[in-house]
Amino acid sequence: KGPALLWSGDYALAASGIGALGQEALDELTNGRQIQLNFAVEEDAFEWSAETRPADLADQLRLFATKLAQPGWDPAPVERLKLGLLTGFDQQETTPNGLIDRDLIGWLRGDDPRWRSPTREEIAALTPASFRAFWEPLLKSGPIEVQIFGDLGTVDIDALLASTLGSLTPTAAPGDDAPRQIGFPAANSAPRIVRHRGDACQAAALLAWPTGGGAGAMRTGRQLEVLAAIFNDRLFDRLRAQDGASYGPIVASEWPQGVDSGGYLLVGSLLAPKDIDRFYATARDIVRELATTPVTADELARNAGPVREQYARALTGNLFWMYLLEGATRDPRLVRAALFIERDIAEVTPADIQRLAQQYLTSERQWSLVILPEDRGPR
């Protein structure tokens, strides 16, 4: 209800203070200590996070608890956010990359107001009062999940939790009318056209398909990552081989953990306007090949190996485990999915890759978008 101001939280909510203490006062209190207050909007939750150390953990938890119990509403961070967004708004429209950085997630989620970037008018309409009216009830709603990873041998974690987050007044469950689905743009036979106001030699092309999401099918999400790696490898080689085009295409798969929708496989590249048709033709050739001809064992191993190694490195760190287990107290399937990541990737077969290409990368589900300079007419 009312304006969707999720975009305003990442910076201004953490910086708006606690009670009567603004950010400067908090900085003075935590000077020389490893205490943080970071905020993020996830697919199905709001997240406060920090990297700290055992000696500072007690006060770190007190900071979280006090922020939830007595949030501050210093207007200065809201005004700084507003000024910064308005100042950079026009600059972002001078390059294809600027528009992608700002608008890609909104495009891929069907311009859902929860995810799309704000318009200039929406930014200009932001006030400290509207910011507080939007965020204050949200901070008071929903259950709180706590995750702590690290060396806790010298810490009485049960006592710390009981005296901080555990002492908060129970919060009301969120209303059931909140949309739990994440959308995707309607398929199109011709690319959507977006204009930038920069160099006439710069453009970008995007191609995407919806996939899925959810903890119950994380194995499919891992398999799609391997498919994306194979697609990326082929696309990179072919674009470089064609007239020496020096582009850096990217193919990425996204599979949300907390909701059963919103996943996608995205293919994109910055390029010259004259090369857009060639890019799409090459990408569609690869799609057709993946769906009709199984990849070789060598190609599969060459691309699955780096994906598995990347996970193996990430799994040695606390932050990655926190990411993997977000929501696990509500959905224990996430624990099992986290424990079997490397096995899921190692067991991907050529038949899996072909099946996924046939299932997801179809023309009936395909969405595309091009970013062209303003002086280029419709294609």
Predicted segments with their positions:
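M16 family metallopeptidases and their MPP-like homologs
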Residues: 1-14, 18-70, 80-90, 94-123, ...
